[in-house]
């Protein structure tokens, strides 16, 4: 769902390291990037639930990252803590679903949240498209805002 986000960042000239649980999704991602830009994409298959393997993959990144976009399911805290431990100064964006309670921390931990909502169209609602998710996450990254909602999460009884 974040493939468009990766492509958008690469199109801006950024270098991106993408981690995903399946090699097939990483291969599809790589193939979707223009050949001339693929040198700015590194991929690592890694199940984020295996913290040792994740730490190894993160340590293998050749250039210290300035930002990380983490969309991990519960329990996400160990993954986020590992990213923070390895890269203390990183701009960490945590992507969460519409029903996830947004953490209210001291600002030192997971201080940037991107909450994915839904879209209301007339008397119906729908979940965000992959393109809307990707565009919203890139916008959130570039905005510098501590909290961003893509779409809406209210009224909750209108969700799909």
Which residues does each PLM region occupy?
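Canonical Rossmann dinucleotide-binding motif of NAD(H)/NADP(H)-dependent dehydrogenases/reductases
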Residues: 1-17
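Rossmann-like short-chain dehydrogenase/reductase
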Residues: 2-5, 25, 48-116
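Conserved glycine-rich Rossmann-like NAD(P)H-binding loop of the short-chain dehydrogenase/reductase
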Residues: 12-28
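Residues at the starts of beta-strands that form the adenosine-phosphate
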Residues: 14-16, 40, 91
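The conserved SAM/SAH-binding core of class I Rossmann-like methyltransferase domains
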Residues: 19, 44, 95
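Rossmann-fold cofactor-recognition segment
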Residues: 33-53
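A short acidic, often aromatic-flanked loop/helix-cap motif at beta-alpha or helix-coil junctions
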Residues: 49-52, 100-101, 118-126, 155-158
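C-terminal helical subdomain
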Residues: 122-159
């Amino acid at each position: 769902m974040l493939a468009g986000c990766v492509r958008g960042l690469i199109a801006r000239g950024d270098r991106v390291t993408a981690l995903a649980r399946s090699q097939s999704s990483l291969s599809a991602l790589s193939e979707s990037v223009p050949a001339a830009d693929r040198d700015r994409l590194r991929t690592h298959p890694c199940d984020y639930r295996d913290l040792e393997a994740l730490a190894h993959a993160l340590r293998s990144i050749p250039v210290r990252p300035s930002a990380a976009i983490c969309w991990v399911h519960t329990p996400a805290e160990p993954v986020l803590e590992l990213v923070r431990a390895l890269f203390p100064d990183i701009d960490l964006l945590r992507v969460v679903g519409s029903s996830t309670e947004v953490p209210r921390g001291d600002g030192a931990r997971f201080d940037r949240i991107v909450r994915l909502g839904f879209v209301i169209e007339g008397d119906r609602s729908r979940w965000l498209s992959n393109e809307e998710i990707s565009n919203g996450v890139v916008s959130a990254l570039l905005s510098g805002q501590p909290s961003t909602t893509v779409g809406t999460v209210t009224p909750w009884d209108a969700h799909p």
